[in-house]
Amino acid sequence: MVRVAVVDRDYCKPSKCNLECIRFCPVNRSRKKKAVDLAEDKSRAVIFEDVCIGCGICVKKCPFSAISIVNLPDELEKVLVHRYGENMFKLYNLPTPKTGSILGIIGRNGSGKSTSIKILSGQLKPNLGRYSNPPEWDEVIRSFRGTELQTYLSKLANNEIKAVVKPQYIELARKALKGTVRDMLKKADERGVYSDLVKALNIERILDRSISELSGGELQKFLIAAVLSKNTNAYFFDEPCSYLDVRERLRVARSIVEFANPARNYVVVVEHDLMILDYISDYVVIMYGEPGVYGVSSKPYSTRVGINHYLKGYLPAENMLIREEEVKFKISARGESAGKQEFPILAWSNIEYTYPSSKFRLIVPPGRVHSGEVIGVLGPNGIGKTTFIKLLSGELKPVSGDILIKPERVVIKPQEVSPSIMSEETVLANLKKASQLVVDPTSWLYVELVKRMRINRLLERNISDLSGGELQKVAIAVTLAQEADVYFLDEPSAYLDVEERIAVARVIRRIVEERRKTAIVVEHDLMLQAFVSDKIMVFWGEPAVEGVASSPLDPREGLNLLLKNLDVTVRRDPESGRPRINKPGSVLDREQRQRGLYYIVD
């Protein structure tokens, strides 16, 4: 067995602890050669993997949960691709891009997806685990002899592959790029496709705006357009659907297929929205392992089979269990039974609201929401979804109509999360302020919100030090920990990987069912909405001008209405029950359109 010891440099704080990892280590106490010691600069602990016996005492004793130790099969070391440094993340295997098809990559955050993209795009040279004495390209290529990666890496080393990457974190572009969208895109255009891309991605309205003024979704589309403008033979897209609504996600997916030209080029997409990844990819690889500790790239699977294996939590080609629970989508059963013999928490008549400043108008027909229900809200950005919740909470007053049953308390998780939305300095203090029960390890609320969402190792961290995904999970936990009649969660899946999205969906359902309250969830990931929602409200209209909503509908009716507006047909996978987008013009697409069924449940 190979022992992998990782010390998280962000968590390890020797100056703030009693060095429990060193003091309690049985090897340190019984042998001359230490297994754990302080680094020379005393900034962190160092674990010597060849001496460590893997007892796990340091893992349990560390007050900051900074240490991880795992044992891996010896065979994995033969396919070690990269290690960042001493007691740092290890990557095994690499996804294999192929011309003629689009490669999709699925996996948890911290499992090596972005590292793989950096290597495949030439930003990072693999060191085969020898971080202190990195090998030359010839040795790296020899280690992949007999595989398709040998050819790819040979081209990469000889500069025959010119790669361009759409990064995962797009906020940095706002600070780095100066000028208008029009000027930047014309400057980036190496293929003469400027006009076609502007039309395909629907960005005409933002051409004269400065990069610094763009919203998250607008910035995302600008960067995708800039990447597709480049005359290269390898395109990499790291989470291209973040910040985008359903219509824009489909628009981006179609643009990537059309302009990246996968028939001649290498195209790789990392995406957590499995419905979009299924639509765009020809085959997938699954990144699994222990986040932040090690990651392994699976063998390639066809898209449908690979995603289903991922949802099952078992990879047959590797004989590897990657999750204990299987994810199944059973939409119709819950949708039909929801709300029976329950009391109403919300009710409203036909209401209308107009903003005095912008003249934006929202029209909502009568509706009623019962205890124990999760209401999914779907529709474009800027169409009135947040205005609707402000009307329900009493923050805004309708111009006509009335809220017939008003909730006593509404708690809101906003769309954009930042440290400024938290009132306390640390994660623990914010959770404790929301509810004393949520920080009690013996309570069900702690199990659901802290353990299930893996916030327990973040408790002592400062809010300002959290990543986007960590802050998102803390914001969700703080919202759901509070006592309220209605929980409003605006895009809770942003920054989260597939595993975390599933965990959040289960937590929302559990809290709502246990407390007999209501949750209203605005979410653009249709698969997540299908998983979590009892009823669905659909918003449509013209952004910033007029929004029209439906009443809360059965999931089948709601999704059918949304997809009809999007002009897309969707079927359910017979094995997993997950929604899958039909290819335009396919037999199923034509049959469903003829029947008027844009979403088929059975």
Please annotate each region the language model reported.
Residues 210, 239-240, 491-492, 499:
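Walker B catalytic motif
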Residues 223-224, 252, 476, 504:
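Hydrophobic anchor residue at the start of the ABC signature
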Residues 98-108, 114-190, 273-283, 287-304, ...:
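ABC ATPase nucleotide-binding domain signature region
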Residues 2-16, 20-27, 35-46, 53, ...:
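Pre-NBD coupling/linker segments of ABC/ABC-like ATPases
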Residues 249-263, 501-515:
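Helical segment within the ABC ATPase nucleotide-binding domain
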Residues 189-207, 441-458:
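Conserved ABC ATPase "signature" region
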Residues 210-214, 462-466, 470:
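Conserved ABC ATPase signature
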